[in-house]
From Swiss-Prot:
Quaternary structure, from the entry: Homodimer.
Protein name: Succinyl-diaminopimelate desuccinylase
SUPFAM superfamilies in the cross-refs: Bacterial exopeptidase dimerisation domain, Zn-dependent exopeptidases
Tree of life domain: Bacteria
Family: Belongs to the peptidase M20A family. DapE subfamily.
Organism: Neisseria gonorrhoeae (strain NCCP11945)
Catalytic activity: N-succinyl-(2S,6S)-2,6-diaminopimelate + H2O = (2S,6S)-2,6-diaminopimelate + succinate
Recorded name of the encoding gene: dapE
Cofactors that this protein relies on: Zn(2+); Co(2+)
Pathway in which this enzyme or protein is active: Amino-acid biosynthesis; L-lysine biosynthesis via DAP pathway; LL-2,6-diaminopimelate from (S)-tetrahydrodipicolinate (succinylase route): step 3/3
Sections of the chain in a coiled coil: none
Active site: 70, 135 (proton acceptor)
Length: 381
């Protein structure tokens, strides 16, 4: 196998316009390729979402790669320098929607599996891939549903690598070994609509909420810890009024979000918000949505193996970090003993002209292969 195979598979995946939750047979392509080296494929489709669980072997330890074949919309196609679903090599980079997030990662792991199995046909344990077409969307029928199926039948993962783009300045410089939780609130502050010249006959919800708003934004929710930054509270939307300049609004809608560390809990944050609103006499309705709990993989075998593989392949020392947004790791952690995220550069994800460095592609595949070898080979390398 030449090192161009990762590039060619990445191109084949990018050329399929799999805008979430449409898979465009990307998973079929992966299954056909991995079937040749002994992987069994199980399709787990829910609604419009396609998921596939691919596994080679029946014993522990289980090393699983998790990824998604869906991509975000392209945005204005005319702003791209080359068609987003026509993978293009230019200036030492591979351009196309999904190049960084995250079809290149998938391609690199598949080719890593091919090389590893060729060299170690009787390897220890099992290799698995959990692939979904619903990561960029609502994420309701994707990885979370597959995890439920696996959990129900007692199928657990020892080591999981999520192929999200994690590199900042150079391939391998950062490994995500955890993520903050995400808790959102949809707050409706209730008032009484009236003429702006007669405020005594109305109740302005903007005014009644203002003191609580100040306290919410100044509150120190926690101090963070050695793994996580302090919990953050951010308001994303505030809407009120009819558009007229002479009407006191009857309601104010406020949308906000917590990105919270392991120093805080979902229940605790909710209680503190309600206490602040009640303290200021706000009349309100508040709906909550938690899209993920914080999780952490402490430095251990998987992080050590990954850092060694990166050092040997890329010549850099990987930093462990929990920064950034949420990923499907929040679902997989329920059945995975150790979990990290490791992939290409995140500099252009979701952007016009999304791309990865061409010379990073064989390196990433080599990193994945070294991880497999150190975890599953008959003899560690």
């Amino acid at each position: 196998m030449t090192e161009t195979q990762s590039l060619e598979l990445a191109k084949a995946l990018i050329s399929r316009p799999s805008v979430t939750p449409d898979d465009r047979d990307c998973q079929k392509l992966l299954a056909e390729r991995l079937h040749k080296i002994g992987f069994a494929a199980e399709e787990l489709h829910f609604g419009d979402t396609k998921n596939i669980w691919l596994r080679r072997g029946t014993k522990a330890p289980v090393v699983c790669f998790a990824g998604h074949t869906d991509v975000v919309p392209t945005g204005p196609v005319e702003k791209w320098d080359s068609p987003p679903f026509e993978p293009t090599e230019r200036d030492g980079r591979l351009y196309g929607r999904g190049a960084a997030d995250m079809k290149t990662s998938i391609a690199c792991f598949v080719t890593a599996c091919e090389r590893f199995v060729a060299e170690h046909p009787d390897h220890q344990g099992s290799i698995a891939l959990l692939i979904t077409s619903d990561e960029e969307g609502d994420a309701l029928d994707g990885t979370t549903k597959v995890v439920d199926v696996l959990k129900a039948r007692g199928e657990l993962i020892d080591y999981c690598i999520v192929g999200e783009p994690t590199a900042v300045d150079k391939l391998g410089d950062m490994i995500k070994n955890g993520r903050r939780g995400s808790l959102s609130g949809n707050l409706t502050v209730k008032g009484k609509q009236g003429h702006i010249a007669y405020p005594h006959l109305a109740v302005n919800p903007v005014h009644t909420f203002a003191p609580a708003l100040l306290e919410l934004t100044q509150e120190v929710w926690d101090e963070g810890n050695e793994y996580f930054p302090p919990t953050s509270f951010q308001i994303s939307n505030i809407n009120g009024g009819t558009g007229a300049t002479n009407v006191i609004p009857g309601e104010l809608n406020v949308k906000f979000n917590f990105r919270f560390s392991t120093e805080s809990t979902e229940t605790g944050l909710k209680q503190r918000v309600h206490a602040i609103l009640d303290k200021h006499g706000v009349q309100y309705d508040l709906q909550w949505s938690c899209s993920g709990q914080p999780f952490l993989t402490h430095a251990g075998k998987l992080t050590d193996v990954a850092r060694t593989a990166i050092a040997e392949t890329c010549g850099v020392e990987a930093e462990l970090s929990t920064t950034g947004g949420t990923s499907d790791g929040r679902f997989i952690k329920a059945i995975a003993k150790e979990l990290i995220e490791l992939g290409p550069s995140n500099a252009t994800i979701h952007q016009i002209n999304e791309n990865v460095r061409l010379d990073d592609i064989p390196k990433l595949s080599a990193v994945y292969e070294r991880i497999l070898a150190r975890l599953l080979a008959e003899k560690a390398v």
